């Protein structure tokens, strides 16, 4: 019988393949996106030192969101992570979509982060 691999297993393979080529530095950290069924998370990471510089998610108390799993929530998370990064003096980042397609919630987060001042 033919077995079908799960979408998440395929995503993890894709993410590992991309991460082998992509790394964040102190000057240009990595904006990482993780998407679950209910929430979306974004982190700005310095891979050289292994430090998370800034993070935001739909679980933050700063965001008052009714539906945390839609594109509007992802837009608010993108704005918040960009605002926090700019406050820390970070303007250039490398976008890591986490193996997800650049579509829907991931795209909404990325575009909101760009409009709020991050360059990638």
From Swiss-Prot:
It comes from the Bacteria. One of its GO terms (molecular function) is structural constituent of ribosome. InterPro entries: Ribosomal_uL18_bac-type, Ribosomal_uL18_bac/euk. GO terms for biological process: translation. GO terms for cellular component: cytosolic large ribosomal subunit. Keywords: Ribonucleoprotein, Ribosomal protein, RNA-binding, rRNA-binding. Belongs to the universal ribosomal protein uL18 family. This is one of the proteins that bind and probably mediate the attachment of the 5S RNA into the large ribosomal subunit, where it forms part of the central protuberance. Part of the 50S ribosomal subunit; part of the 5S rRNA/L5/L18/L25 subcomplex. Contacts the 5S and 23S rRNAs. This is Large ribosomal subunit protein uL18. It comes from Bacillus pumilus (strain SAFR-032).
